[in-house]
């Protein structure tokens, strides 16, 4: 939260880190790619409720897991979802600050919580694909 307060207080232009990576400050009132970003209070609280509800369900799923990979992957998803939900509660929007752009294409800004969710989902998919099926 200190980092977000710092970035928000700067009112800065994007900070160039590399030729393809900047630090920016974007307030996302929706979800991925700004979907459901109407900015209305009802949407904010519905998204927050949904994130917590899904997280609770995933915690129950974690408790049933025996594989470390699945536990870590689900933990990343839960951590990311809760992190973004806390942003919504505290700030009214999710603070996104990583900007990646390559060959004229710019990916929508994202944050550490988004990265955790993405890595967690990738690990879950890989685990499902690489685990031998038992008969």
Say what each PLM segment does:
Residues 1-135:
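Alpha-helical transmembrane bundles and membrane-interface segments of multipass inner-membrane proteins
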């Amino acid at each position: 939260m200190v980092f977000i307060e710092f970035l928000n207080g700067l009112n800065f232009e994007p900070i160039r880190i590399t030729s393809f990576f900047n630090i920016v400050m974007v307030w996302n009132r929706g979800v991925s790619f700004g979907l459901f970003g109407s900015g209305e209070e009802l949407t904010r609280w519905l998204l927050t409720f949904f994130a917590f509800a899904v997280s609770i369900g995933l915690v129950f799923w974690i408790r049933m897991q025996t594989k470390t990979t699945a536990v870590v992957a689900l933990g990343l998803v839960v951590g990311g979802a809760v992190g973004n939900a806390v942003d919504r509660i505290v700030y009214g929007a999710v603070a996104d600050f990583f900007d990646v752009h390559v060959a004229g294409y710019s990916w929508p800004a994202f944050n550490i919580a988004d990265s955790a969710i993405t890595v967690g989902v990738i690990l879950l998919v890989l685990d499902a694909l690489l685990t031998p099926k038992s008969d």
